[in-house]
């Protein structure tokens, strides 16, 4: 899968789940399971419920996402 194949969307974190996983509600109303990207883990970026985030979805599984950015 090339980097061009990902779908970027905005969303809001609804709740924390175990293992750095979050329930994220997207702009279009869908709710997906999101995990933190490796760079965010390395830099200890914390995510709390209510934070606005940017997620990447693959066309293969639209129920899971990777959280790549937390808006301030």
From Swiss-Prot:
UniProt keywords, alphabetically: Cytoplasm, Initiation factor, Protein biosynthesis, RNA-binding, rRNA-binding
GO molecular function: ribosome binding; rRNA binding; translation initiation factor activity
Subcellular localization(s) per the UniProt record: Cytoplasm
Quaternary context: Component of the 30S ribosomal translation pre-initiation complex which assembles on the 30S ribosome in the order IF-2 and IF-3, IF-1 and N-formylmethionyl-tRNA(fMet); mRNA recruitment can occur at any time during PIC assembly.
Family per similarity comment: Belongs to the IF-1 family.
Organism taxonomic ancestry: Bacteria, Pseudomonadati, Pseudomonadota, Betaproteobacteria, Burkholderiales
Stored Pfam families: eIF-1a
SUPFAM superfamilies in UniProt: Nucleic acid-binding proteins
Occurrences of domain S1-like (ranges): 1-72
GO cellular component: cytosol
Protein name: Translation initiation factor IF-1 1
Function, in words: One of the essential components for the initiation of protein synthesis. Stabilizes the binding of IF-2 and IF-3 on the 30S subunit to which N-formylmethionyl-tRNA(fMet) subsequently binds. Helps modulate mRNA selection, yielding the 30S pre-initiation complex (PIC). Upon addition of the 50S ribosomal subunit IF-1, IF-2 and IF-3 are released leaving the mature 70S translation initiation complex.
């Amino acid at each position: 899968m090339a980097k061009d194949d990902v779908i970027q969307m905005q969303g809001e974190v609804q709740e924390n789940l175990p293992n750095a996983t979050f329930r994220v509600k997207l702009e279009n109303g869908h709710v997906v399971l999101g995990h933190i990207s490796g760079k965010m883990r390395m830099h200890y970026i914390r995510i709390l419920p209510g934070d606005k985030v940017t997620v990447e979805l693959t066309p293969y599984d639209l129920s899971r996402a990777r959280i790549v950015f937390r808006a301030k």
